[in-house]
Amino acid sequence: MDSKEVLKEYFGYDSFRAGQEDIINAILEKKDVLAIMPTGAGKSLCYQVPAMMLSGITVVISPLISLMQDQVKSLNDVGINAAYVNSTLSESEIDGTLNMVLNGIYKIIYIAPERLESAKFCEFSKQADISMVTVDEAHCISQWGQDFRPSYVKIVDYINSLPARPVVSAFTATATNEVKTDIECILRLDNPKVVITGFDRKNLYYSVEHISGKNRDRYISNYVKEHIDESGIIYCATRKNVDTLYETLSSMGISVTRYHAGLSNEERKRTVSYTHLTLPTIRLV
């Protein structure tokens, strides 16, 4: 199948969005790629489609467990065999997953950047036929960005340790010129195809309110009550802030759940499942 046939067969689309086909063609020509595209523009398809066409497997480096789980579920739902390896799995489950990859069961495997340093994964990588390494949320590699993750800087060491250098593709929705340069340099992208489709999302409205700390919780509580028939996501700076706001809204009788790394695997799974159900109705962030 060619890329358009893969797109139709697995994802049900007849045509590509802006930038997607250029990225996919570059990957299939074994060229490194850096893509800067807004959220919702279809970045994932840009590596998932060629992953189905390349001879080996694709390793996707993703910073969040919830993102991995969501992507893998979506792929499995459309008939693409994908898996993840992260801290929610037992050692025996990890061993089983990696063996299934080696046996050709899975074409795409999602991992956290920290996993690249584990002896088990490094040994697996030496045995696996890795055609592409995809770096999702690639802005995490840059100290210019507020989401800097030190483990992202070591991705290039992992790539260099592989028996044969794979295609390297990097994707982000947010990158200043400094961050873009960092991604190219730190990952040592080889004369990459750079695709920038813009940042503007015409379906979103942005508003900024300057609220002092002591009035913040009251403002949020009132705002939620005013939009009681709508669903939304509230991002907080710390786990403690998440827990405090969760308790406040719960005490008001508002249907609310929470998600952060300090929760049990079971509670995080429940939250992800709940979010999947409510995602189509989310109107506020």
Language model: regions and residue ranges:
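Helicase motor core with emphasis on the C-terminal RecA-like subdomain
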Residues: 28-29, 34, 69, 73-277
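The conserved Walker
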Residues: 39
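Single conserved hydrophobic/aromatic residue that forms the stacking wall/gate
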Residues: 276-285
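Hydrophobic/aromatic ligand-binding patch that stacks against planar heteroaromatic rings
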Residues: 25, 50, 74
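Conserved pre-motif I regulatory segment
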Residues: 1-36
